[in-house]
Amino acid sequence: MRKIRVAQIGTSQYSHGSEIFRTMATNPAIFEIVGYAMPEGEREKFPHMMGTFAPYREMTVEEILADPTIEAVVVETEEIYLTKYALQVARAGKHMHMEKPGGIDPVAFEELIETVKRNKTVFHLGYMYRYNPCLVDILARVQAGEIGDVISVEAQMSGWRDEQQNRFLSAFPGGMMFYLGCHLIDLVLRIQGTPKAVLPYNKQSGAFATSSKDFSMALFEYEHGLSFVKTTQAERGGFLRRQLVITGTKGKYEVRPLEINVAYPMQKTEYTYCTSEEWNDAGTHVASEPFHRYEDMMLAFAAMVRGEKENPFTYDYEWQLYRTLCACCE
């Protein structure tokens, strides 16, 4: 199996750049890490995170892009810089894994999509639930018609954070919707496709002394029903109430919680499957085996770079997802 020579650009306080880098480092038979760059002052802003990168060579972005032996780049900067560096990687003709959802400029993101599409390079985004084995199985069953025609999807992803992270949300249109709601919108679109209309609600909860929109919902209109996503940073105990409910004409899947930390980054997922028409039927409860949150994601990326696997998330899909996210952030 051919190793992928890879480098990483950036990391961030509230995303998963360090975990992604560690995942590559613990798979040396798959990834040969050439180095990393911290172009937006990450070393000074996040000194506590630098130990993960210390054994490897620090480079400039220009050195990474100019090295013809580096075929793949991981872009993990803070969200507001993602598209800026992703565009540079795309223009250099390199394959790319990028933290979700991209920067806040739709025009720049469209240019990014056009560039990777023209170059036919791998464009792989780090949406958290795409490689959750339970959700992969459930969505395949739903798409195969196991619960009949889908009527609605309800998705929630909340938690409680401190005031500093709440202030961080002010950098984004839609606040929490942009930051975490994107994961949920991805699920809704994969299950039901593009909605006929979107109705966004992005509010300030008042739980923190900030102006950030930390309470977000969006309603999606479909032909035969309504779906919604909800995300807030003002819900204590919200992590274990993160959930996905898929209601169909012949059954229902209720995934709750979406993740349980076992020994981070190891996770478990629990869900209930119900097809009975009896009011008191609790359905069948299933608990997954522990799985690594990032390993399947990065191993899939490597397989795409080697040409062994086709990316199921097309350029056009990523562009439609981003546009829908923007509509939910208004």
Q: Can you say where each PLM-predicted feature lies in the sequence?
A:
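Contiguous beta-strand/loop segments that form the cofactor/metal-binding neighborhood of enzyme cores
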Residues: R2, Y179, D186-N261, S288, ...
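Beta-loop-alpha module in the N-terminal Rossmann-like domain of NAD(P)-dependent dehydrogenases
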Residues: T52-T115
